Amino acid sequence: MTDTQVTWLTQESHDRLKAELDQLIANRPVIAAEINERREEGDLRENGGYHAAREEQGQQEARIRQLQELLNNAKVGEAPTQSGVALPGSVVKVYYDGDKGDTETFLIATRQEGVKDGKLEVYSPSSPLGGALIDAKVGETRSYTVPNGTEVQVTLVSAEPYHE
């Protein structure tokens, strides 16, 4: 996350991300020990194990920073309990440009909070589509602009609270 933004998370998602952060922080000494062990193997220019351990450390530190920023700027709340209104944490079904036969179902949430099994697409409330749907009621049509500049009409068919 490059710019600071508030992210809505359920308590369950917050706890899951916090546990991941705690595990990554606890794993720091393990990676540091592996780097030291690989460093002792000799010439660092040709030491693949050393470079792999350093790469792993870099990826882990990047994820730690990402999780810290996310959790520091998270708004923790309950998933919506209200049906019929598109809110962060809602599973919505929509159709585009008046084509009622072509529907799409997705979760309005952040990628970090999103569906673990990958069976449901996730659109951020701050994305053009997600933002257009926030607070829309079933049957309401809204418009949003896609990256190529085209305006798209989207109609909310249903909105239900997401349950993990």
Curated annotation (Swiss-Prot):
Keyword RNA-binding annotated: no
Signal sequence coordinates: none
Coiled coil location: 50-76
Gene3D superfamilies: Transcription elongation factor, GreA/GreB, C-terminal domain, Transcription elongation factor, GreA/GreB, N-terminal domain
MF annotations from Gene Ontology: DNA binding; RNA polymerase binding
UniProt entry keywords in alphabetical sequence: Coiled coil, DNA-binding, Transcription, Transcription regulation
SUPFAM superfamilies attached to this UniProt entry: FKBP-like (SSF54534), GreA transcript cleavage protein, N-terminal domain (SSF46557)
InterPro entries associated with the record: GreA/GreB_C_sf (IPR036953), TF_GreA/GreB_CS (IPR018151), Tscrpt_elong_fac_GreA (IPR006359), Tscrpt_elong_fac_GreA/B (IPR028624), Tscrpt_elong_fac_GreA/B_C (IPR001437), Tscrpt_elong_fac_GreA/B_fam (IPR023459), Tscrpt_elong_fac_GreA/B_N (IPR022691), Tscrpt_elong_fac_GreA/B_N_sf (IPR036805)
Stated family: Belongs to the GreA/GreB family.
Stated name of the protein: Transcription elongation factor GreA
Species of origin: Mycobacteroides abscessus (strain ATCC 19977 / DSM 44196 / CCUG 20993 / CIP 104536 / JCM 13569 / NCTC 13031 / TMC 1543 / L948)
